[in-house]
Amino acid sequence: MVVATTIALYASPPSSVCSTPHQISCDLDLTSRSSSTSSSMASSPQKPIVGGLSSLFSSASVKSSSSSSCSYSTGVDEFSSLRYDRSDDLKDLSFSSSFGYSPAKFVNSFRRDHQSPISVLHGPVSCSCSPPMRMSRDRNLDGSFRLGASGLFNGFVRKALGSCVDYEFGSDSVLVDELTFPMEVDTIKPYARDLLRRAQLRHKIFNDESVIKAFYEAEKAHRGQMRASRDPYLQHCVETAMLLANIGANSTVVVAGLLHDTIDDSFMSYDYILRNFGAGVADLVEGVSKLSQLSKLARENNTACKTVEADRLHTMFLAMADARAVLIKLADRLHNMKTLYALSPVKQQRFAKETLEIFAPLANRLGISTWKVQLENLCFKHLYPNQHNEMSTMLEDSFDEAMITSAIEKLEQALKKAGISYHVLCGRHKSLYSIYSKMLKKKLTVDEIHDIHGLRLIVDNEGDCYKALGVVHSLWSEVPGKLKDYITHPKFNGYQSLHTVVMDNGTVPLEVQIRTQEMHLQAEFGFAAHWRYKEGGCKYSSFVLQMVEWARWVVTWHCEAMSKDRSSISSSDSIKPPCKFPSHSEDCPASYKPNSSQDGPVYVIVIENDKMSVQEFPASSTVSDLLSRAGPGSSRWSMYGIPAKEELRPRLNQIPVSDLKWKLKMGDVVELTPTIPDESLTEYREEIQRMYDRGLAFSRPGTMVGWGS
């Protein structure tokens, strides 16, 4: 039998904010998901989907009242078999596309320590800063570099993100006997203790008691679960949480990152997480689970290969989930892409294609360039290995480290002479995939791309950006037509910077990017940089402020609904009324939520004859409107009447439709034709005939058609 499923989601912003579309994506599986937990642990029944996807972040009372409804069961994502133990092999891929040079310290050591042909495209080395603000870099255990105590991250990032960020590193882990929650010490495996100890050395937030508790709960939930290489699944959970910590996520988000697969892959339920960690964490984990389910559905239907539908899917996904759940899903996908080698070549291609078309654009829409670059380069490596290797070698051979070092010294002296202080002056390199895409799009050779080599300068304020630009143009010849003022005219995702291309020694083009600290924060971390941002401390253009607030409001729609009837949750977790747009109080949950009143359009996923399409409907569309568009010949039942037998009726959020005028809302799930076993066809033949007769009667003038009995 034909099964048609519809998922309706709004894509437009609230009327008072910027209407620029955003993108996101995720993983959906409507088949049964098996659990590989210990046999001694009974599996909790899945919670039903009530109100469709719009109930992802509904109140606990709503969730409880819906327990009698039917639910989808989910299936294991192929990524559950991935592993992560080759940190040395992957360290070159874990960096962003920018890196720095020190005139003396790393001239000889860079090539010796980084033999990978693509290391020059990903690995930061050293930065030059004007006294007394010169910064040192310390190497993390995960292969990335972090600025020192007086550096960029501990300076403007903490100021921008407030208590949401903790970039301090601590070497002292919390002792077991200091914890306030009970822990089965004897049952904890040695590898888990070591994993936590190493995580605590990499980031201080893993010393937080709630994070430690989540770690041990994740260990218990995934105990015995292994990836394809037989490495513990817990390692993936830790790496996902570490990625979140490294972009400034607070303990709530890191805890949810550790637990992100527990609902799908273990005995844990939403209620279990709610009791142990509160509604905030439980909602995030459930949100990630639903995003994974949707992405699975899109992947199975090859939506990523359909440009228009993929773009609609990005926008639709952005409108359905808490931003923090979106970031957790992105971190999950980024780590899975780093360990994609564990899958078969066919699956590698499929996941890389989906990541390139869905997840990388999502990271771009949210402005998280560090993740976008890594995702794109990893996809490039798996989708086009020959081109990847060829370009890596070509760029390694053509890379002129001495030229970059000389340019840094020259600009440093000129800035000092002009009295312009700065925070960072470093070399940067365009990413492999970005170069490849530009060559294809504009039909250029590598020699014709002017922004492969470059410098990045971070100054105090907007005025200094333009002063520094004048200094740059006084040192080198400007390439006509290559000046781009993204400060006055920001990109759609809020990116701001000055870009210019100059000729060094008349032969080698050199791109120079100039921005403020706040602009750099926006460029690197995008939406994530503004979870707790105080707008009063930064002079952003009104456009960028709109984009920041739009990201806050668009990522979920349920703010006002969540503020009602949360009697089962402690007062500390209760939802306050949303602040007036666009400002928010420090702890206002509305900083993650959009206005709940949306006025269209509605994006709808329609699955029919095992094919999925993403369609757009006007606001206030009804089930009848959807059926009219589908047409009478597209399914087995008549659009003019609905049978009395509930088994044959279309279903809205698992409930048989009783009124065709029901409006499609954000996240509604509509099954146009339930699957009927062949042995039941005889039983329903009479009912199907009545449906057909009703359709004929409807076509006669003046005939009213009811439900029939």
Curated annotation (Swiss-Prot):
Expressed in which tissues: Expressed in roots, hypocotyls, shoots, cotyledons, rosette and cauline leaves, stems, petals, sepals, stamens, pistils and siliques.
Catalytic activity as recorded in UniProt: GTP + ATP = guanosine 3'-diphosphate 5'-triphosphate + AMP
GO biological processes: guanosine tetraphosphate metabolic process; response to abscisic acid; response to wounding
EC class name: transferase
Keywords tagged on the record: ATP-binding, Chloroplast, GTP-binding, Kinase, Nucleotide-binding, Plastid, Stress response, Transferase, Transit peptide
Record-linked PROSITE patterns: HD
HD domain ranges (all copies): 233-337
GO cellular component entries: chloroplast
EC number(s) on file: 2.7.6.5
Compartmental location: Plastid, Chloroplast
Induction summary: Circadian-regulation with a peak at noon. Induced by wounding, salt stress, 12-oxo-phytodienoic acid (OPDA) and abscisic acid (ABA).
Keyword Transmembrane: no
SMART domains: HDc (SM00471), RelA_SpoT (SM00954)
Keyword ATP-binding: yes
Family to which this protein belongs: Belongs to the RelA/SpoT family.
UniProt-recorded name of the protein: Probable GTP diphosphokinase RSH2, chloroplastic
Name of the coding gene: RSH2
